[in-house]
Amino acid sequence: MARELLLLRHGKSDWSEQVEDFKRPLKDRGKRGAQRIGVWLLQYQLQPDYVVSSPAERAIITAQKAVKVMGQDADKITQDRRIYAARVEDLLQVLAETPKSAKRVLMVGHNPGLEALTEYLEGKRIPLPKDGKLIPTATLARISMPNDWKKLRPGDGKLDSIIRASSLDKKFPFPDPTSKEMRDRPAYYYNQSSVIPYRIKDGKPEFLLVRSSKQKHWVVPKGISEPWLTLQASAAKEAFEEAGVEGDVGSESLGSYKYEKWGAECSVQVYPMLVKNLIPEDEWEERHRGREWLSPDEAIERIKQAELKPMIKKLAKMLEKQKSKK
């Protein structure tokens, strides 16, 4: 046995929303379950070198949550429609097309397909636990595989273990997988970045503020730093999503601040961002927020986060100084 197949069933889905099955979202419980499996894989150094997922909402989000916790690039997950509502034959075909270089593959999908594939590879019926579920939601099956992903026959695999997220710690180690401190969310959630978007109009600086997701106050783009990106690149990603802007993020931080969330302190690094492109209103996915260009004084007056006020003032002075040198 030279390779390993990791079969992960999606996390617990949310049936409260009236949506088609393909678009059914995860519950928060389902997201945490996926992250616990990811942490377990990281702790045992079982990170996959190839990830393929059903594109159904509950499956791809499960894949992303698990992969991010391991510090891997969620954008590199391969999505394959055949995994959704799949027969064993479909899943075998997906595996047959796996890159030859892949030694450990993570496939994220659904039942009954994953259970059927597990028994096919084991070559026999697998005794069920007391609850009658072989692979319930947010559960991982580890299967040792032969050296070739193609032409897999019954009995070619060996089921090594089945890990349920429900059996793992409810909290997450911080700041690394071997730490004893436990927190409510994965470690990377507490490392965040933000940008203050600006432009020069008629020789004067203007700053772009957006409304918070619940439209209660004015903010600048901020979010969890993606583990595989730099703080600046993560902040640029948030700016595109939350404010509908693209531009150049400065290499030097304007400062940082901390705030309480998820039972601990989150640290936020703040960067200047020169806006080069404003996404048209009808193409901006979060246009419900609203956005507005403001003078430095207006931005300082409106911004909710007190720690950002001196940073806006600092950036305005920096821009004025640059102007005077020209």
Regions inferred by a protein language model and the residue ranges of each:
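Active-site-proximal alpha-helix that buttresses catalytic centers in soluble enzyme cores
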Residues: 2-83, 126-127, 223, 234
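Conserved Nudix-box catalytic region and its N-terminal flanking loop in Nudix hydrolases
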Residues: 18-25, 203-246
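A short coil-to-beta-strand element that immediately follows conserved catalytic motifs
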Residues: 72-79, 245-255
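A short, structured active-site edge motif that brings together acidic residues
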Residues: 74-90, 134-137
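Domain-level recognition of soluble alpha/beta enzyme cores
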Residues: 122-158
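NUDIX/MutT-family hydrolases
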Residues: 141-144, 161-167, 270, 280-314
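Acidic, metal-coordinating catalytic segment for phosphate/diphosphate chemistry
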Residues: 169-196, 200-202
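Active-site-adjacent beta-strand/loop module that shapes the phosphate/pyrophosphate-binding cleft
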Residues: 247, 256-280, 292-294
